[in-house]
Amino acid sequence: MGVKLLADGCAGASSSPALSRVATSAAHGEGSPYFAGWKAYDEDPYDAAANPDGVIQMGLAENQVSIDLLEGYLREHPEAAAWGVAGDGGGDSFRDNALFQDYHGLANFRKAMARFMEKIMGGKATFDPDRIVLTAGATAANELLTFILADPRDALLIPTPYYPGFDRDLRWRTGVNVVPVHCDSANGFQVTAAALQAAHDEAAAAGMRVRGVLITNPSNPLGTTARREALEGILGFVARNDIHLVSDEIYSGSVFAAPDLVSVAELVESSSSRARHRGEDDDGDVGVADRVHVVYSLSKDLGLPGFRVGVVYSRNDAVVAAARRMSSFTLVSSQTQRTLAAVLSDEAFVDAYVAANRARLRERHDHVVAGLARAGVPCLRGNAGLFVWMDMRRLLLGDGGDAATFAGELRLWDRLLREVKLNVSPGSSCHCSEPGWFRVCFANMSLATLDVALERISRFMDAWCKATIGKFNHLQPNRCEVNYFALERYQGHVQQ
């Protein structure tokens, strides 16, 4: 059969030309409830005046509680963001910003970033500006490190629950597998040696070469900091297995209550110091410092996700060199670097900002926890981040069976989204091992909007409790926990 030609003589086809496997891969994960909730919000966004019955976005970990402090600083110091004309003394000239700059980042900005990271980590670790590699946000930093540390079909181990975006960030373009390290609520979802080994064995049985462990500390979605002993256990695990550790610490400056953050950078530095004191090159484990890499960003602690500023930090010379080469695909604009170098170099402002931001986050966190408690909904005890880990496991008991299920969790999530009009992230999208947990973000909206959201949850719980009392009165004792919980919640509300 001859080739069919269009009228102009070109070969025709019944469909569009094929795209690459990366472009058409389902590994992006856009069909997950995490992204579906965002879509529902985009289609029906809440507005107090224009759309009061719309969806409230509680699935976005964005820090808006202190943006006014940065706005105030720039009003008082307009030169920080000003464009002057060359030679007029009115700030960096347009020419300075427009022409090619050092791909490794401006020296004054890397120096300011190093000092800022030291400050928010309590001065317990030092950062060499020459080892800072800039990227367009933490998403780019994590993907860049994945490209450097692993090959397609290799595996990274990630303790659960973890940030849903990691399935996209680490897998989609790299071809690397993500293997969950299953943690549970019995110990506050802390990582254990047994859980790490089980995940490693699972990956090996599937024919995957494990190349590293990635953790978030403070945790997204838990809003907690990792215990020192847990971090030491992870360091020992990666050393014994000759693999890497990536520690995503983008919420380091958002720790607002005890215990204080323990960064892996602090542990590596103290370990290296002890080794030097003993006259050794390292701490006895083969190159522990060489296998630990830190990711940071200004998106959360400064509330600047639109500026796209991320950092890869490593003591491994080969990793730093590779990251610099690859960072040409994910540069930070000169204007962004110059503006933020001015802001971060003002020590008095930075000190005031960090203290105020932590105080505001604690106040907002406590407000949410108290509001949920009044509605009869507990949360995991948190001390960091922009979210709470909400426990709705009791609402799943009796939903289609005696035990809570992930199917029941998704039905509850759908009700919260479609009926209550709240976009929260279900625990299953974070690969949580227990159904019934939800991540609820609280810093990306006004206090007034947050109170609307809490009132909606309270009304939903009222309705659920009233329905549950009648529904379960005739059931067996193993259902009584739900009945008693509902009765207690309902009677307590009436007494108020």
From Swiss-Prot:
GO terms for biological process: amino acid metabolic process; ethylene biosynthetic process. The keyword Cell division does not apply. The modification N6-(pyridoxal phosphate)lysine is found at K300. It catalyses: S-adenosyl-L-methionine = 1-aminocyclopropane-1-carboxylate + S-methyl-5'-thioadenosine + H(+). InterPro entries: Aminotransferase_I/II_large, Ethylene_sulfur-biosynth, NHTrfase_class1_PyrdxlP-BS, PyrdxlP-dep_Trfase, PyrdxlP-dep_Trfase_major, PyrdxlP-dep_Trfase_small. It holds the Pfam family Aminotran_1_2. CDD domains: AAT_like. GO terms for molecular function: lyase activity; pyridoxal phosphate binding; transaminase activity. Coiled coil: none annotated. It is an enzyme of class 4 (lyase). Its cofactor is pyridoxal 5'-phosphate. Expressed in leaves. Expressed in shoots and leaf blades. Expressed at low levels in leaf sheaths. Its EC number is 4.4.1.14. Keywords: Ethylene biosynthesis, Lyase, Pyridoxal phosphate, S-adenosyl-L-methionine. Pathway: Alkene biosynthesis; ethylene biosynthesis via S-adenosyl-L-methionine; ethylene from S-adenosyl-L-methionine: step 1/2. Belongs to the class-I pyridoxal-phosphate-dependent aminotransferase family. Catalyzes the formation of 1-aminocyclopropane-1-carboxylate, a direct precursor of ethylene in higher plants. This is 1-aminocyclopropane-1-carboxylate synthase 4.
